[in-house]
Amino acid sequence: MTTSHQPQDRYKAVWLIFFVLGLGTLLPWNFFITATQYFTSRLNTSQNISLVTNQSCESTEALADPSVSLPARSSLSAIFNNVMTLCAMLPLLIFTCLNSFLHQKVSQSLRILGSLLAILLVFLVTATLVKVQMDALSFFIITMIKIVLINSFGAILQASLFGLAGVLPANYTAPIMSGQGLAGFFTSVAMICAVASGSKLSESAFGYFITACAVVILAILCYLALPWMEFYRHYLQLNLAGPAEQETKLDLISEGEEPRGGREESGVPGPNSLPANRNQSIKAILKSIWVLALSVCFIFTVTIGLFPAVTAEVESSIAGTSPWKNCYFIPVACFLNFNVFDWLGRSLTAICMWPGQDSRWLPVLVACRVVFIPLLMLCNVKQHHYLPSLFKHDVWFITFMAAFAFSNGYLASLCMCFGPKKVKPAEAETAGNIMSFFLCLGLALGAVLSFLLRALV
């Protein structure tokens, strides 16, 4: 009876807003790690000035090789990637977990807007420091503090967005995943353009950081526009109501009447305003979504275990000494290839959601991704110690990477979409937060697994 009165998402405005928010969660951090060469170059120079260093094939290879002095590879530069991973993964896990328990006590608007503003501030400071000279140790410490802050607020932002999308129809988690996929594509293109242009490291890095600021500002504006969307308000009010009130709430909205609490409740509400029945047991929710939660965790464990630790070490077998081998093979065949097909996989869930949320095929397909571990490890990886190179030709690697990336994007997006729909509407936000935690757990486990897989090649 009431379904005919449900508002439509006019011009797909809410869908597009969540797409931009998804882009805003990942693009800043992707640009930050894309500028790793800029950070290590500043740590490698005694005066900490990288303003005159050009980005070239030679400098890219040198910075990737710990045995190369450039002019002298400092101890801070040598440990940069390991410490960066630690400073990124620990806050990501801790704050995603905290958000699962505290999201009802801290308002949603504070968590999302506060996180976006904090990330914006960090990137403004980062862009400013490109032009500031300082000693290597101070630069290293400040950079690690920024990494902790970006990932702490990024974890809160991502978990809160997945929780917010959980109160909408299932396919509204897809634009967040798709936006995150597009972030990877943008950074890959930016990396290739920077290498091709031979631009100074500082100029490329400054461009990355300013672009990140612009995207975060756009995400803030989009989030502020959400309360004006009737479609969004409709599902938010439905979620705020208890199960017995939902039918009445639908009728009130369809007749143009404001539910009790007026327009104020129609804004971007904080979980502290939710009724007591939202305080559901975490264990009960986990019992409903554990298969999907473990699935998304396993997906990202396999993905990060191989990409980029193993895949970025593959070299072209057909290019000889051409620029394709030395400059473009890894940026194109590895990073761009992965990000394009990952984005396509994530985006496909907007129009196709097979298999269904209760289908046994979903966890089976997730488990089948383990086959990519031997396939990619048997490609033409540099410095093989234990495994032969059975798939030497570039076509094998490019094909495996495309399937690897597409399955990652599609299956992960399905799991994230279905998780909040396996529970009651009042539990959807908590379920979304829990799914986000297991996603981050998969990233952390994958980072640990990557050391083992690389050592076994």
From Swiss-Prot:
Pfam families: Nucleoside_tran (PF01733). Changing residue 33 to M: Increase in the sensitivities to dipyridamole and dilazep. The keyword Signal does not apply. GO terms for molecular function: adenine transmembrane transporter activity; cytidine transmembrane transporter activity; guanine transmembrane transporter activity; neurotransmitter transmembrane transporter activity; nucleoside transmembrane transporter activity; purine nucleoside transmembrane transporter activity; pyrimidine- and adenosine-specific:sodium symporter activity; uracil transmembrane transporter activity. The chain crosses the membrane at residues 13-29, 83-107, 112-130, 139-157, 175-199, 207-227, 292-311, 324-343, 361-379, 395-414, 433-453. Residues 255-266 have a biased composition (Basic and acidic residues). Residues 30-82, 131-138, 200-206, 312-323, 380-394, 454-457 are extracellular. It comes from the Eukaryota. Changing residue 339 to C: Increase in the sensitivities to dipyridamole and dilazep. The modification Phosphoserine is found at residues 254, 273. InterPro entries: ENT1/ENT2, Eqnu_transpt, MFS_trans_sf. Signal peptide: none annotated. Transport activity is sensitive to low concentrations of the inhibitor nitrobenzylmercaptopurine riboside (NBMPR). The record marks 415 as: Essential for nucleobase transport. The keyword Membrane applies. It is found in: Basolateral cell membrane; Apical cell membrane; Cell membrane. Uniporter involved in the facilitative transport of nucleosides and nucleobases, and contributes to maintaining their cellular homeostasis. Functions as a Na(+)-independent transporter. Involved in the transport of nucleosides such as adenosine, thymidine and uridine. Also transports purine nucleobases (hypoxanthine, adenine, guanine) and pyrimidine nucleobases (thymine, uracil). Mediates basolateral nucleoside uptake into Sertoli cells, thereby regulating the transport of nucleosides in testis across the blood-testis barrier. Identified in a complex with STOM. NCBIfam families: 2a57. This is Equilibrative nucleoside transporter 1. It comes from Rattus norvegicus (Rat).
